[in-house]
Amino acid sequence: MQGSVTEFLKPRLVDIEQVNSTRAKVTLEPLERGFGHTLGNALRRILLSSMPGCAVTEVEIDGVLHEYSSKEGVQEDILEILLNLKGLAVTIEGKDEAMLTLSKSGAGPVIAADITHDGDVTIVNPDHIICHLTGNNDISMRIRVERGRGYVPASARAQTEDDDRPIGRLLVDASFSPVARIAYNVEAARVEQRTDLDKLVIDMTTNGTIDPEEAIRRSATILAEQLDAFVELRDVTEPELKEEKPEFDPILLRPVDDLELTVRSANCLKAEAIHYIGDLVQRTEVELLKTPNLGKKSLTEIKDVLASRGLSLGMRLENWPPASLADDL
């Protein structure tokens, strides 16, 4: 390893162990000493706070006016029911919210499979228990599910809503993150004669709405995008060569391939001559859904990937495309 004193080892993905459908262990090595904790902690925080997902945000239960009450014929009180509803693992395709309905009668458990929904909604854990009915009683409720990011307490949404919110519409603390548990461990690694290196092992469990490997990839992409701003600091050290602020965000000038979309989605965009991210963000959802072979699942994937980079569909870009790209389009 002569001559590499000032060079950093470049880590490589060593192994992805799929423990089950919702849990995986990702091993990354070799890392310079100390970088195991640096990268592990950063990825852990992003996975817990920044992964987009879907969650229950509002519930209306027939005969219930507030959460500090109970319903006749139901074993659980309303607070327990709301807590159980937070455990629903749901995905929505092609839109940002959906209304689900539940009606059940007769003694026995009420589970997620009893919920009625349209084809745009998928409930990943249909056996999840919501409550238990006793005797010949019934329960009916309407459940609002929304797409979001991070954790949004009900109190925060209550402050922004109008005072005319109907009595009986119960707000739920929404945890949108599909990552249920994340932990990392740093072990010793060796390359040739060096024994002071790190091996990073990330152990992650999701709620089933996202593949653990995909979650790791998205979190790493988010981290890399955020660090781009620090890379650009080198331009500030050359005041004599100070240039005007670029007309467009550099990310808009990147090819669509950098989004690492599925093959189906990428091919659909290429067929529509959407070559750059700047081309893509100017399209609306309606326009993309008119694209042959591009369905709601692909649309949802595109929206999530753009959201992870602080972008969205339907943006307006004046003077697009720039001269540097005009010849290529």
From Swiss-Prot:
<feature type="region of interest" description="Alpha C-terminal domain (alpha-CTD)">
    <location>
        <begin position="248"/>
        <end position="329"/>
    </location>
</feature>
<dbReference type="InterPro" id="IPR036643">
    <property type="entry name" value="RNApol_insert_sf"/>
</dbReference>
<dbReference type="InterPro" id="IPR011263">
    <property type="entry name" value="DNA-dir_RNA_pol_RpoA/D/Rpb3"/>
</dbReference>
<comment type="similarity">
    <text>Belongs to the RNA polymerase alpha chain family.</text>
</comment>
<dbReference type="Pfam" id="PF01000">
    <property type="entry name" value="RNA_pol_A_bac"/>
</dbReference>
<dbReference type="InterPro" id="IPR011773">
    <property type="entry name" value="DNA-dir_RpoA"/>
</dbReference>
<keyword id="KW-0804">Transcription</keyword>
<protein>
    <recommendedName>
        <fullName>DNA-directed RNA polymerase subunit alpha</fullName>
        <ecNumber>2.7.7.6</ecNumber>
    </recommendedName>
</protein>
<keyword id="KW-0548">Nucleotidyltransferase</keyword>
<dbReference type="GO" id="GO:0006351">
    <property type="term" value="P:DNA-templated transcription"/>
</dbReference>
<feature type="region of interest" description="Alpha N-terminal domain (alpha-NTD)">
    <location>
        <begin position="1"/>
        <end position="234"/>
    </location>
</feature>
<dbReference type="GO" id="GO:0003677">
    <property type="term" value="F:DNA binding"/>
</dbReference>
<dbReference type="GO" id="GO:0005737">
    <property type="term" value="C:cytoplasm"/>
</dbReference>
<keyword id="KW-0808">Transferase</keyword>
<dbReference type="InterPro" id="IPR011262">
    <property type="entry name" value="DNA-dir_RNA_pol_insert"/>
</dbReference>
<dbReference type="Pfam" id="PF03118">
    <property type="entry name" value="RNA_pol_A_CTD"/>
</dbReference>
<dbReference type="GO" id="GO:0003899">
    <property type="term" value="F:DNA-directed RNA polymerase activity"/>
</dbReference>
<dbReference type="Pfam" id="PF01193">
    <property type="entry name" value="RNA_pol_L"/>
</dbReference>
<keyword id="KW-0240">DNA-directed RNA polymerase</keyword>
<dbReference type="InterPro" id="IPR011260">
    <property type="entry name" value="RNAP_asu_C"/>
</dbReference>
<comment type="subunit">
    <text>Homodimer. The RNAP catalytic core consists of 2 alpha, 1 beta, 1 beta' and 1 omega subunit. When a sigma factor is associated with the core the holoenzyme is formed, which can initiate transcription.</text>
</comment>
<comment type="function">
    <text>DNA-dependent RNA polymerase catalyzes the transcription of DNA into RNA using the four ribonucleoside triphosphates as substrates.</text>
</comment>
<dbReference type="GO" id="GO:0046983">
    <property type="term" value="F:protein dimerization activity"/>
</dbReference>
<dbReference type="InterPro" id="IPR036603">
    <property type="entry name" value="RBP11-like"/>
</dbReference>
<dbReference type="GO" id="GO:0000428">
    <property type="term" value="C:DNA-directed RNA polymerase complex"/>
</dbReference>
